[in-house]
């Protein structure tokens, strides 16, 4: 299926593979699976958004994203679940296994279920080892989130990562340069996740042309001469917004570009 909103095209397709039972189409819009022993649902989605530094493209390509979606599904449709899982695990562990953390010679296997550990920490009933394990788990959970939401060729992790459940998410799922985006990316180099830093680097580069324009409009010299450098403020997004989002003082934060380039 495809959806187009103001030149933005969103395409998505599903492939449903059943073992036993049958699949039927209902009302031309729904798939009905009956009496199956198991089903595997493969989903691919894409848009015509292109992150670039050339305003003439207006961030949209002329390509139909449905073709990319179909090509992706064609590559995996005949693969077994075990093969897909193995590919995923190999890809994930190539990053996750770059470092290990062990606080006090703890076993790598869970010492207790996570919900039990969280409850125990809240109620102060955990042992020292259980709390250490939970802290270690929480540390690695942060790495998991970044590995899952910031990969080469993608956009950087925003306020909700890739887990926004709505078409319009809180704070527009954008980027806040006064602390949030830094909190997402501070761990990349210290925890050996350099490849996950690349989307952030490319995103910063894409802001430069609009940032130069904003700097000229807001901070031009008294004699009207050109300013040097570029700027972005409290909020920015994938559409190149670098101006203050509102008139309030917190939004007038010209140090955003400096923060991101540290």
Regions found by a protein language model. Give the residues of each.
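Beta-strand-rich recognition/accessory modules
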Residues: 17-82
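Active-site-proximal, well-structured secondary-structure segments within enzyme catalytic domains
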Residues: 86-129, 153, 158-168, 226-228
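Carboxylate/His-rich catalytic cores and anion/metal-binding grooves
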Residues: 139, 146, 178-229
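Active-site-adjacent "gating/activation" loops or surface patches in catalytic cores
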Residues: 213-261
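Extended, hydrophobic/aromatic-rich amphipathic alpha-helical segments that build helical scaffolds
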Residues: 43, 135-149, 257-262
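Structural helix-adjacent loops and short alpha-helical linkers that scaffold large soluble proteins
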Residues: 79-83, 104-105, 125-135, 146, ...
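Short, small-residue-biased leader/transition segments that mark boundaries at the very start
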Residues: 2-5
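Solvent-exposed loop and edge beta-strand segments that line ligand/cofactor-binding
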Residues: 123-132, 169-178, 244-255
């Amino acid at each position: 299926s495809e959806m187009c909103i103001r030149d933005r095209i969103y395409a998505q397709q599903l492939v449903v593979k059943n073992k036993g039972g049958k699949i039927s189409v209902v009302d031309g819009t729904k798939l009905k699976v009956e009496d199956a022993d198991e089903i595997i649902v493969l989903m691919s989605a894409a848009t015509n958004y292109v992150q670039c530094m050339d305003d003439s493209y207006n961030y949209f390509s002329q390509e139909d994203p449905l073709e990319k979606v179909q090509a992706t599904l064609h590559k995996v449709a005949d693969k077994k679940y075990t093969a897909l899982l193995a590919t995923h695990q190999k890809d994930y562990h190539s990053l996750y296994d770059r470092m290990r953390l062990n606080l006090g010679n703890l076993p790598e296997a869970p010492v207790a279920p996570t919900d039990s550990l969280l409850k125990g920490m809240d109620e102060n009933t955990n042992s020292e080892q259980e709390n250490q394990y939970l802290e270690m788990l929480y540390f690695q959970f942060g790495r998991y989130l970044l590995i899952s939401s910031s990969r080469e060729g993608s956009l950087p992790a925003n306020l909700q990562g890739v887990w926004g459940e709505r078409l319009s998410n809180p704070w527009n799922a954008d980027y806040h340069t006064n602390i949030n985006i830094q909190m997402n990316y501070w761990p990349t180099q210290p925890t050996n996740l350099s490849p996950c830093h690349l989307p952030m680097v490319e995103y910063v580069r894409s802001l430069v042309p609009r940032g130069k324009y904003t700097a000229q409009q807001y901070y031009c010299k008294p004699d009207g001469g050109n300013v040097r450098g570029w700027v972005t403020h409290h909020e920015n997004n994938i559409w190149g917004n670098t101006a203050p989002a509102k008139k309030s003082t917190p939004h007038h934060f010209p140090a955003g570009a400096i923060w991101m380039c540290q």
